[in-house]
């Protein structure tokens, strides 16, 4: 059974645990709820506190002295956000959760977009910039963010950045589309649904919703 397989008798603990660590995806459920315009999973202050902690403890401004026994997605003077950190005075399991020292791009984009959604714009953009600087076309291929292989799909979490900035929401049942952008004065955003895609633009107090391909059946615009 699981206990027999993962129990480490010598050290008296389960293997592959987070323990008292700070995990990059600790509020992942709230991220999904935010993107899908669902009810809150956690209190707002708890989510913001968690995202603050992820940036404070998991973001590494210089990889040169970062010890990583696993796969190397960042090195030397590069920056990145690690999977799980163990802040000072927090006990680290002898055998922690696998890949905890790595900087996986899909997780980094998820955390960064969530920071932006919850008002931590500068922190989120710093995390995104760290990824893109590693894949600048000189050191690595900018079109192939390697994780568990070439062209790994998890980096598509970067699409959530568009949703974070535009505040795009859609309710198919009510035929309602909405935009709650972090920039209120003027903006131009791309939107996409299963039936089509287009743009929304606000300029000089005028809002323009365009369908560039396919169709869009609406009853409400919020």
Task: Show the residue positions of the predicted features.
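Extended glycan-interaction surfaces of carbohydrate-active proteins
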Residues: 1-104, 136-137
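Non-catalytic C-terminal accessory modules of carbohydrate-active enzymes
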Residues: 74-79, 90-93, 97-103, 108-222
């Amino acid at each position: 059974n699981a206990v027999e397989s993962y129990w480490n008798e010598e050290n008296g603990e389960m293997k592959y645990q987070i323990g008292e660590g700070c995990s990059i995806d600790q509020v992942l459920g709230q991220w999904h709820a935010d993107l899908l315009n669902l009810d809150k999973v956690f209190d707002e202050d708890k989510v913001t506190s968690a995202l603050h902690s992820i940036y404070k403890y998991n973001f590494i401004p210089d990889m040169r002295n970062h010890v990583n026994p696993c796969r190397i997605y960042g090195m030397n003077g590069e920056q990145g956000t690690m999977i799980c950190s163990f802040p000072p005075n927090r006990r680290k399991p002898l055998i922690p959760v696998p890949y905890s020292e790595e900087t996986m791009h899909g997780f980094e984009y998820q955390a960064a977009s969530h920071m932006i959604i919850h008002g931590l714009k500068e922190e989120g953009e710093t995390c995104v910039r760290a990824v893109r600087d590693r894949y600048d076309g000189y050191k690595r291929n900018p079109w192939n963010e390697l994780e568990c292989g070439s062209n790994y799909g998890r980096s598509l979490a970067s699409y959530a950045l568009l949703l974070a900035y535009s505040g795009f929401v859609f309710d198919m049942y009510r035929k309602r589309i909405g935009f709650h952008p972090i920039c209120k004065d003027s903006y131009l955003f791309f939107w996409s649904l299963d039936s089509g895609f287009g743009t929304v633009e606000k300029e000089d107090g005028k809002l323009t919703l365009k369908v560039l391909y396919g169709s869009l059946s609406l009853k409400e615009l919020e």
